[in-house]
């Protein structure tokens, strides 16, 4: 997809699970579980996705996903898995690498959106900015 001078790419960064009750709020489980199944801990499986905007001058990553450096306790609680999806693999499928990212835009401070900003394999070049 292209918007203005930017080509847009969907970048899958990880899989994880969140409590179905927290995700669906006041919607009763018998209603939402018709479409989404939960595991034995009532977590629903989700995929984190970032958006990459590419122009001749910039490669802008919007959000970074969960990241990879989680204590085992939190990996287990949130069922974080980067085996199938991670930033490097997803950027690579489009011919890019994290070293080419010039800017990162953080939409908000939830771990599944900015977890890779401060401690992960995502490496920004010295001219990259958040």
Region spans (language model):
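A short, local hydrophobic-aromatic micro-motif
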Residues: 9, 99-102
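Conserved beta-strand hairpin/beta-sheet module of binuclear metal-dependent hydrolase folds
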Residues: 3-7, 14-89, 93
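Short, glycine/acidic-enriched loop or turn micro-motifs at the edges of active sites
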Residues: 66, 111, 126
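Conserved small/polar residues in nucleotide/adenosyl-binding loops
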Residues: 120-126
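Metal-dependent catalytic neighborhoods of phosphoester/phosphodiester hydrolases
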Residues: 115-119
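Metallo-beta-lactamase
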Residues: 101-112
């Amino acid at each position: 997809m292209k918007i203005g001078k930017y080509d847009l790419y969907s970048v899958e960064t990880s899989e994880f699970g969140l409590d179905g009750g927290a995700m669906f709020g006041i919607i009763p489980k018998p209603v939402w579980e018709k479409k989404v199944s939960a595991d034995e801990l009532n977590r629903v499986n989700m995929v984190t996705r970032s958006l990459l905007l590419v122009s001749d001058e910039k490669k802008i990553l919007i959000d970074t996903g969960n990241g990879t450096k989680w204590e085992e306790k939190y990996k287990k609680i949130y069922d974080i898995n980067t085996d199938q999806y991670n930033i490097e693999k997803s950027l690579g499928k489009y011919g890019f690498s994290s070293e080419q990212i010039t800017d990162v835009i953080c939409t908000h401070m939830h771990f599944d959106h900015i977890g890779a900003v401060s401690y992960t394999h995502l490496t920004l070049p010295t001219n990259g900015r958040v």
